[in-house]
UniProtKB/Swiss-Prot annotation:
UniProt-listed SUPFAM superfamilies: Photosystem II reaction center protein L, PsbL
Subcellular locations according to the entry: Plastid membrane
Native species: Cuscuta obtusiflora
Listed Pfam families: PsbL
Gene Ontology CC entries for this record: photosystem II reaction center; plastid membrane; thylakoid membrane
Gene: psbL
Function: One of the components of the core complex of photosystem II (PSII). PSII is a light-driven water:plastoquinone oxidoreductase that uses light energy to abstract electrons from H(2)O, generating O(2) and a proton gradient subsequently used for ATP formation. It consists of a core antenna complex that captures photons, and an electron transfer chain that converts photonic excitation into a charge separation. This subunit is found at the monomer-monomer interface and is required for correct PSII assembly and/or dimerization.
Disulfide bonds: none
Keywords recorded for this protein, A-Z: Membrane, Photosynthesis, Photosystem II, Plastid, Reaction center, Transmembrane, Transmembrane helix
Name of this chain's protein: Photosystem II reaction center protein L
Length: 39
């Protein structure tokens, strides 16, 4: 039971971290593109 629950929790954490990194990367790209277009 514990072996099955641990990988599931790890995958959930990886998905959350990857989602946060993706949002941060999109935010940075949006700022860079906005600066490029305004300049």
């Amino acid at each position: 039971m514990t072996q099955q629950s641990n990988p599931n929790e790890q995958t959930v954490e990886l998905n959350r971290t990857s989602l946060y990194w993706g949002l941060l990367l999109i935010f940075v790209l949006a700022v860079l593109f906005s600066n490029y277009f305004f300049n």
